[in-house]
Amino acid sequence: LRCLVGSEMCIRDSFDLTVGDMMNESILGRAQERDIIRIEAHQIRDYTLNKQKQVDDYPYGGGRGAVMQADPLYQCWKHICEEAGERVHTIYLSPAGRTFHQGDARRLKDSYQRLILVCGHYEGIDERFVEECVDEEISLGDFVLTGGEIPAMAVADAVCRLVPGVLSDPECYENESHWNGAL
């Protein structure tokens, strides 16, 4: 998912869900048509080398369940960074992350030209990828979802709508309940 004026946000997921489709509709879709923001979804399975396009495996070092493999995640991350010509600020959407607030949306919009949002699945993602590539972990709250796509879309929407020109009138968001900490 790519977002922001002259900048990029990428959502990376392992399932053929409608992340790209959902982000191409309504206000964000119109903003993309006007080249105000750019949103792009990357399919992690395209970066695996096995014939089955498998992206899950047992955790490195043991543990319960399956995690997303480090290599396909890393290959996708590397591809996006090479395309951008720089290391891109990377956020892993995780129930263990810091809770996301409106202030975070403003900080991300103001601080970064490009963002990568990594969607976990299964029991999460390989910790080696987190240690090597992830700059921060964000959660939507104290609950667990089946994957990171919904949180990634929420974060992307919250950040992108702050980009000048996305909303028709800046007062639309300046008068919202969370803009100045009213709630």
Which role does the model predict for each range below?
Residues 49-51, 56, 60-75:
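A short aromatic-anchored loop/beta-hairpin motif
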